Amino acid sequence: MWFKNKYKLVTENPYNKKKLNGLGMIIYDEWNDSFRIIMQHKGIVHLFLNYSLGWKCSDYTFLECLPLLNTLEIIDIHSKGIKSIEKQYKLVTLSLNIPNGYGINYKVFSDLKSVFCYGKKYNASLFSCKSIENLYIDELKIGDKHAINQLINLRELTIANSNITSLSFLRNLKYLNSLAIINCKRIQSFIDISELNNL
């Protein structure tokens, strides 16, 4: 059969090994519409796409035609058509390790809880998505012009490889119980961390 060893059905996240609520799928090959049929037949609600595992895609517009997903995690060197992800408005977990994924409107994801993304460009819709509880933002290169302080429901926050200089925004994040600051060499003071009572 054409799809032998080209995908795998999983019941846990392949990266953090957390148990999934529903069935997941890892695709090890180039996108083919037969994958969509399999997803519909099996009731797939979690999708993992990683080019280092064999995933290939030149255009992500196929996301518009998929069943509604709870989880979408993409690691790729291509991002053409990635705005089609906005049709997946039921996403709870979204991880985009891709180039040029900055134009996505996060406001469409009313149930979104967990996000991994890059922050080289400002995206107001990301910082207005108050449902987010877990945010990992890499390459946040917009200095202190972000609006992380608006994400008042954050429980877990990781900022990596950033040029931020101030942590004053932490004062607004009353529910934060996990904080990681990685390779952010321009931060001038860490005193604001003392305001976080739940760490």
Across the structure, where does each feature detected by a protein language model lie?
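Concave beta-strand-loop units of leucine-rich repeat
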Residues: 2-37, 43-64, 68-165, 172-188, ...
